[in-house]
Amino acid sequence: MAFSLGELERLVAYQIGAALAVSTYAGHPIRYVKCHGALGQQTYHSAEIATAVCRAVKAVDPSLVMLSIARGQQDRIAAEMGLITKSEIYADRGYDETGFLVSRKLPGALLKDPVQAAERIVRMVREGAIETTSGAYLPARIESVCVHSDTPGAVEMAAQVLSVSYTHLRAHETREDL
């Protein structure tokens, strides 16, 4: 079912409002908004869809952080609208030459080896760039790393990414970084 941009904005605002109400009632208010799945991918590519989502967040609670796929439209638009933004990369997904996720139908779309995924994350953070399946690097802000829970071995991968990232990245910080 397709929605108009206005309908999308209102639906997102409603969902954020409901999530805020329930989470606040439970004593754990949400702090960020992340579009999931197809909507997240659409906010990466479409300035219009990203704008509708960002307008909804800004209207409901402009203090919420917008967690966006690195290098996408949503990240840029959220910043232009004065929202707090954080760019996210995926430990378990491959990137094409444009910096977007490789289709799950293609080879290289899903990374399954926890050690390789963790080492790649360290390289990307150090380079400040997304590593594509060809080995090229595309500049990107990297402030969050996601491991999809439905990836085989997701728990092990997340643990490995955390361990290797902490060990390798923390060891290279200077006193000014701390």
Which sequence ranges carry the predicted segments?
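Conserved, mostly hydrophobic/aromatic
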Residues: 33, 147
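Active-site rim beta-loop-alpha module in soluble metabolic enzymes
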Residues: 73, 77, 85-125, 129
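Glycine-rich tight-turn/loop motif centered on a GG-T
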Residues: 1-9, 43-44, 100-112
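Charged helix-capping and loop-helix junction motifs
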Residues: 46-52
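Conserved small/polar residues in nucleotide/adenosyl-binding loops
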Residues: 167-174
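Catalytic beta/alpha-barrel core
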Residues: 63-70
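C-terminal helical cap(s) of enzyme catalytic domains, especially alpha/beta-barrels
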Residues: 154-166
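Glycine/small-residue-rich loop that forms an oxyanion/phosphate-binding "nest" at active or ligand-binding sites
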Residues: 1-25
